[in-house]
Amino acid sequence: MTLQHTPLNAIHRSLGARMVDFGGWDMPVNYGSQIEEHHAVRRDAGIFDVSHMCVVDLTGARVRDFLRGLLANNIDKLQTPGKALYTCMLNPKGGVIDDLIVYFFREDWFRLVVNAGTAPTDIEWITAQNAAAGTGVAITPRRSDNNAGAEPLGIVAVQGPNARAKAYAALPGTQAVGEALKPFNAGFATIDGVGEIMVARTGYTGEDGFELVVPAAQIAGVWERLLQAGVRPCGLGARDTLRLEAGMNLYGQDMDEHVSPLDAGLAWTVDLQSERDFNGKAALAANGQRDQFVGLLLRDKGGVLRAHQKVITAAGDGEITSGTFSPSLSQSIALARLPKDVAIGADVQVEIRDRRLTATVVKLPFVRNGKALVS
């Protein structure tokens, strides 16, 4: 199978990145040291190419009506232009088709950012739902592989305690917009030599920063300017350890179409209180929450917590969904789905190869804004 390339592929290779197949995309896993890249984001500023993710513009007079039924979170929370919302898109059984961010810019224009591997099926699902609802929404993917004639867009994420300041230095024109943005808000800035870009105060690391949506033809110049300002290039390896420390789900690993958001720690993204109906609402109401989604800290030596390891508790067995060695905490951590009756602070046993090692159940996240929240 031929791998897809982002507009920054040649630059990654010129920087000596180790490239891997990530959901059919040729992506950098690191540029030499995953640990150093991780620490750069926690302590200073790092940049990630996330152009494999897909921007989808939804336009038309009835977009809001359409999204009321498509998304589990309540789109009516978005009343101020630029405001963003994290939500799941569910199937009729209440399983997660994808998790995404939706931005509101005008009553006739909302923007979704969906995951890389799910983008084709997401677009098929959205198209089918639009046809069934008769809402007449125009659906315009903006990724380079499926933009249907619209200008393709790329995305870079600049993350870390110094990310915003370095972005302002690298890209004059972003400061006036960026300083006015609260978290989970976005605006547009015009950059000399680049044109208009979207500046979103969002991320997937547990640190402050921006995600910049840039015309694909200009994104290499934006990347180079940020590197010149002292932002370190970071790969998918560091992105994974950062998001895991921040207690953030990874689609396909921590949840999928067979998992309810209520069992994936995402109840806060589901609005069951409003009168509106949405895909999966009846199933969620009928089934309720069956499991809890928590963190694990490995106490014993001699192993690393990894996905699919069995967790043995007094209330029954659970499973690790994501696990790693935490560079910030210098110990192994995991996200796990456990029976609801297991208490925070309880010790559990994790099967690692032919051994059972002790881990402690903790509330997520492990790390946020450079600070350890567990011990």
UniProtKB/Swiss-Prot annotation:
Pfam families: GCV_T, GCV_T_C. Keywords: Aminotransferase, Transferase. The keyword Transferase applies. Coiled coil: none annotated. It catalyses: N(6)-[(R)-S(8)-aminomethyldihydrolipoyl]-L-lysyl-[protein] + (6S)-5,6,7,8-tetrahydrofolate = N(6)-[(R)-dihydrolipoyl]-L-lysyl-[protein] + (6R)-5,10-methylene-5,6,7,8-tetrahydrofolate + NH4(+). GO terms for molecular function: aminomethyltransferase activity; transaminase activity. SUPFAM superfamilies: Aminomethyltransferase beta-barrel domain, Folate-binding domain. The keyword Transferase applies. It comes from the Bacteria. Its EC number is 2.1.2.10. One of its GO terms (biological process) is glycine decarboxylation via glycine cleavage system. GO terms for cellular component: cytosol; glycine cleavage complex. The glycine cleavage system is composed of four proteins: P, T, L and H. Belongs to the GcvT family. The glycine cleavage system catalyzes the degradation of glycine. NCBIfam families: gcvT (TIGR00528), PRK00389.1 (NF001567). This is Aminomethyltransferase. It comes from Ralstonia nicotianae (strain ATCC BAA-1114 / GMI1000). The gene is gcvT.
